[in-house]
Amino acid sequence: MSTKTIKIYVFKRFERFWHWAQAGLIVFMMLTGFEIHGAYAFFGFEKAVGYHTVAAWSLITLWVFAIFWHFTTGEWKQYIPTLEKVGAMMRYYLTGIFTNAPHPFRQTTLRKHNPLQRLAYLFFLLVISPVIWFSGWFYLFYGAWREWGVDKYLSLEWVAFFHTAGAFMVLIFFIAHIYLATAGHTPTSHIKAMLTGWEEVEEEESAATK
Amino acid sequence: MRKLFATVALLAAQALPCAWAATDPAPAPGPAPAAKPASKSTADHTKFKELQQAFKSGPEVTKACLACHTEAGKQITHTKHWTWEWMNPENKQVLGKKHVVNNFCTAVPSNYEFCTACHVGYGWKDANFDFKNETNVDCLVCHDTTGGYKKLPGLAGHPAYKEMEFPPKSGKMVKPADLAKVAQNVGPTSRATCGACHFLGGGGDAVKHGDLDTSLKNPGKYLDVHMDAKGLNFTCAACHATQGHNIPGSRYTPTAADKEAAHMRGKKDDTNAATCQSCHGQKPHKATGVRAKLNEHTDKLACQTCHIPQYARAQPTKMSWDWSTAGKLKDGKPFTVKDSGGHDAYDSKKGDFRYESHVIPEYVWLNGKVKYTLLGDPVNENGVTKINEFFGSPDDGASRIWPVKVFRGKQPYDLESKSLLVPHTAAGYGVRDDTAFWQNFQWEGALQAGAEAAGRPFGGKFGFVATEMTWPITHMVAPKEDALTCTQCHSKSGRLQNVKGIYLPGRDANPWLDLLGGLAALGTLLGVIAHGALRIYMNRKAG
Amino acid sequence: MLKFIGGVAAGVVLTGALGYGMADKLMFNETMSPFGVEETVARIQHNIQAAGNGWTLSGLRNPARAVQADGGNTLPVMMVEACSTKYSKPILNEDSVRFLSILMPCKISVYKKNDGKVYIGTMNAGLMGKMFGPLVGEVMGQVAADQKKFLEMDPKKPAPPMIVPKAGGEGGGSGGGGGSNC
């Protein structure tokens, strides 16, 4: 395997702040959300609802900033899906990773996510997020349904169903995400990158793309 | 501080033979009893010539009252308090005390002289009572302020006019009412005057309602935040705002969901003035943040559901009554058995009872429609007969979840007609009556006499059927700090565990989604653990 | 070696944590009563009076009353207090454990919970006694055995009347209750 590595700057300061703030909020919302769902008692229902709501508004605020940031910096392009090398990535996770085969994807500042990541994040953005945000929005504004004229079409049971379904998807995403964070060049390289912004990558290839 | 701990409640309330109308003095309004507080009334009845006479009877007093209050008699004679009869316009059922059967003392018709101690009139001793005669109206029972006016069961609505032994053969003497004094001291109704009947319904203190008993004459804040004698000190009429002697708020047609704004002076509003919303409006919770969510509960919950966490918080209320065991005698004599708290557990006259305090209500959907099982209506021999059925559903937009007291019992029914029977229980004062159950303890004669008085057939064979009577809980509103907490409903085995038709977060979940989602998450977790373990293993092998 | 020590340390920490978490369940006991609050109290009171070994009732507290007097609500709770000089005397006579007088008199709490059911709360006198040496351990062991008898209730027997101490009794509600104060 390559003996030399170099460091490249992948995640900018706002991006890192966004990631960790979002991570904290999502974990906290899962914790409070599943309590509201009745899975366990920790904060108590009333506090759990209160915290969950505050966290939701915080996350919305964070997203407003993040969306603004993505569009002004052009970083949104990082999520454009590609099927190129998807097969190679899957083969890598299924076999190559065990034999220390070289990572098929060369990370650069302009292409910081591997093709599977792109697909996964796009899935999060286009499927999980709408499910959880729309259902959550109606859940939160249950009292305004009549005013909005939607009380005839909605039932709390189904709103809660989709919100819970979204929550399970987030939970699954979260488990896989944490694990795959250890599947970089070294087990900690992705995590370090998310903390410091600097990712270790193999030398010659990254040098070439630079 | 010691005093707070000093006594354990000596639960002294004694069940009376049957509702015993007795008024106690209204709580003294101020700390200085020496000087009479300035009255806001424009009339001092002690100065009225009409009232300065030696009244010999109640009707004589009424005649004097009506001399000035010319329309009062007419007004009263149109009320349920007078007619004991009322037709439900919804389903045309004829209700009222004269007609309904309950599972307490069951029914009035054969027992007029006794039961009419709680009639706002004089002389109703049989079916021939003259409902047109306004001088038969009893003004004093509601307007007494002295506490010296008592109507005794057995006297057909009259108070004692001479000293008499009461209850008969008890050795206790009751002094006659000083009618002139009572008449000269009339005033607005009070918790004591309304309570003289309504606190003692069903045969004694705290028997019937559970949320109305004599502890409300002088309640602490804990018991009722509005009637708190040292605080807001509401009278009954503060909420049951009465006009022309017509009192709003009746459980025959409860206002299950008041969707009106708070009543405002000058604005025409014919809706029930006795609801919570009539003062508190539709968004009663002023809080911000998560507590603001409370206002969003008003589309499904009655206010009472959260704000009356338990009823009978000052003294126990009767929860069940089994007539089928009544009539047992010891050495040929009736007897009573007390429970550990000193309340009747058995009475030869009535059967077995169970009392309970701090009762957690049951909860039901109620849209205000109620149907009674009246005499002649079929009973459910193998199950439970509902004396009054509360209707409601989560989807009709008119229902709210209400706290109720469900009073359970067993009472006689006719094996032939399969409908309820009513025993003749009590006779007039001092009357020897062989068919009265409370004198002879014989069912056949009592049921025959009861059926005759009610104009019903009786086949001669009877059994006992299980019955349930439902009472909306609406009094004894606790301070807001003691309202239910969220978790008390939003949990798997909470207060509303048996209420169907709503999705209640924390209680409900789609089991398939939970199973599928849970398995998927677990699968993912196991998958990444296996994947990681394999990586570590392969790495070691290679390294 | 390091792993072994680490393992032992982890085991100790885990046991400690488990013990800490379960201490309340070990030190105190909660059982459901088939009867109402008053009847449960009454049956316990009569069991105490019939238990022998010098047991007398020393009071009946109702802390819910104080909450009510303050304008608030709590579900019914009553504390039956009992005392036996046979057991209190040896402990009170031993200077090193005299502080245990704070556990006197012996208390049994009867209360209703939000599920509408009635529960009986007791202290695990046997286990607690063991923490204070052989003298206390033996006495408390006997107390625990007697306490078990206090809670035996035969539904076939009729409900006895609750024994209510006279109002204004000495000791703030822990008045006579039919027995001597000890």
Which stretches of residues belong to each language-model region?
Chain B
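Positively charged n-region of N-terminal signal peptides that target proteins for export
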Residues: M1-L4
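Sequence context of c-type cytochrome heme-c attachment sites
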Residues: A21-N133, L140-S190, A196-A273, Q277-N295, ...
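Active-site-proximal binding-pocket segments
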Residues: D299
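Bacterial N-terminal signal peptides
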Residues: T7-A15
